[in-house]
Design a protein with these regions (language model features):
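Conserved AMP-binding/adenylation subdomain of ANL enzymes
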Residues: 91-108, 116-156, 170
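Gly/Ser/Thr-rich phosphate-binding loop
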Residues: 46, 129, 154-159, 168-238, ...
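Structural core segment of the AMP-binding/adenylate-forming
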Residues: 1-47, 372
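AMP-binding/adenylate-forming catalytic core of the ANL superfamily
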Residues: 1-7, 149, 157, 278, ...
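ATP-dependent adenylate-forming carboxylate-activation enzymes
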Residues: 7-12, 112, 132-152, 161-162, ...
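Conserved beta-loop-beta connector loops within the AMP-binding
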Residues: 246-275, 311-312, 373-379, 413
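Conserved AMP-binding A3 loop
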Residues: 68-92, 414
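Conserved pre-ATP/AMP-binding loop-to-beta segment of ANL
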Residues: 27-28, 33, 40-43, 50-72, ...
Length: 416
């Protein structure tokens, strides 16, 4: 076992090592851009590489089903699980990325997506196989992202919608630095239509995908049709917010009744759960056979995401199964309410959760982070704005102004 770390984490690493009777080999990466902290080990990463034998006879896996890595779910539900990846799924999804995004040779890829998240959606392998350039970023900083796009001629980047939201809220002079086309792949909660439109105006083409840790990252894509380019910006943004169709490397995708597994009607209205199966689905959860069996009940992987199926085969998520609000017997999509909140000129970030209510059972409660200069915005202002765009029963009954807790990948932690 080898632990590779750097100065930023020296405090927690030293504390962890002190608890071990037999600590593993520790290797330090000395990042010149991070001058604080101290080295934990006397062995430097570059020195370790210099000790290597270029003629070493590597042992290849006996079969493609062998485990290649262990990734933990992000914990947005408060219960992270260890997801075991296999070699076949990893290389197939790496190929799926290239095919789906039509990436040519030698792309310049900016790591706005953490590499530890679903193995960086398999892009460490995709970009390397295409002889591309990896441009690394220690943390998401919108000004630095814009600078690197310009200076390194970045062609591709990935991440959660919050990354795009940070870019569109930069000063106009900073955004003007983008002078060449940039491809951005986003996943997670659907980007608000307003954000997609603003990013397009910056010269960044957004491809919306969807996936989970259990399926190696993105496995569906909102594949774009040329005729959609003739639509209005608002209509294009609405279409781009859909999660789309399956990757060519995913065997099966359906929206179905979570109990019977019967596919729902492709009418764009009937709710069901998204199910997947194929070679780009995990082996299972580490040392958790009960959770694995439940996740694959009926021979399909249960995502826990509620969606509708459109007539053209495109999937559109409406909410997490655990996030849907049931108020007076009516289902309320938190995503729909959040999308409305993002249209308010004062709202920087928003999350909607269920709040217990004696009369209705549950009502929507909105947590909102305001943009700089809009500190005078009141709860009544937000609710009045929503009333112009939503049915009465969907309105937030409570608005809380605060910073929103996030995971290390930028996802909002609603369960907190």
């Amino acid at each position: 076992k080898v632990l590779i770390t750097d100065r930023e984490f020296h405090t927690v690493i030293e504390a962890a090592l002190a608890l071990l009777e037999h600590p593993p080999l520790v290797v330090d990466v000395d990042d010149p851009e991070y001058g604080e902290g101290r080295a934990v080990s006397a062995l430097d990463y570059e020195a370790l590489l210099a000790e290597g034998d270029p003629e070493f006879a590597w042992e290849w896996p006996d079969d493609e089903w062998q485990a290649i890595s262990l990734n933990y779910t992000s914990g947005t539900t408060g219960n992270p699980k260890g997801v075991v990846y296999h070699h076949r799924g990893a290389y197939l999804n790496a190929l799926g990325n290239q095919m789906t995004w039509a990436m040519g040779h030698r792309p310049v890829y900016l790591w706005t997506l953490p590499m530890f998240h679903c193995n960086g959606w398999c892009y460490p392998w995709t970009i390397t196989a295409l002889a591309g350039v990896h441009v690394f970023l220690r943390r998401v900083d919108p000004q630095k992202i814009l600078n690197l796009i310009r200076d390194e001629q970045v062609t591709h980047l990935c991440g959660a919608p919050i990354v795009l939201n940070a870019l569109v809220n930069m000063p106009e002079a900073a955004k003007a630095a983008i002078e060449h086309p940039v491809q951005a792949m986003v996943a997670g909660a659907a980007p608000p239509a307003k954000v997609i439109g603003a990013v397009e105006e910056m010269g960044i083409h957004v491809t919306h995908t969807y996936g989970l840790t259990e399926v190696y990252g993105p496995v569906t894509v909102c594949a774009w049709h040329d005729e959609w380019n003739e639509l209005s910006l608002e209509e294009r943004a609405r279409i781009k917010s859909r999660q789309g169709v399956r990757y060519p490397t995913l065997d099966g995708l359906m929206v179905a009744d979570p109990q019977t597994l019967e596919p729902v009607a492709r009418d764009g209205n009937t709710l069901g759960e998204i199910f997947m199966r194929g070679n780009t689905v995990m082996k299972g959860y580490l040392k958790n056979p009960e959770a694995t069996a439940e996740a694959f009940r009926g021979g399909w992987f249960h995502t826990g995401d509620l969606a509708v199926w459109h007539a053209d085969g495109y999937v559109e998520i409406k909410d997490r199964l655990k996030d849907i609000i049931i108020s007076g017997g009516e289902n309320i999509s938190t995503i729909e309410v959040e999308d409305t909140l993002y249209k308010h000129p004062a709202v920087l970030e928003a999350a909607v959760v269920a709040r217990p209510d004696e009369k209705w059972g549950e009502t929507p409660c909105a947590y909102v982070t305001l943009k700089a200069g809009f500190e005078g915005t009141r709860e009544a202002d937000i609710i009045a704005f929503c009333r112009e765009h939503l049915a009465g029963f969907k309105l937030p009954k409570t608005v809380v102004f605060s910073e929103l807790p996030k995971t290390s990948t930028g996802k909002i932690q609603k369960y907190l």
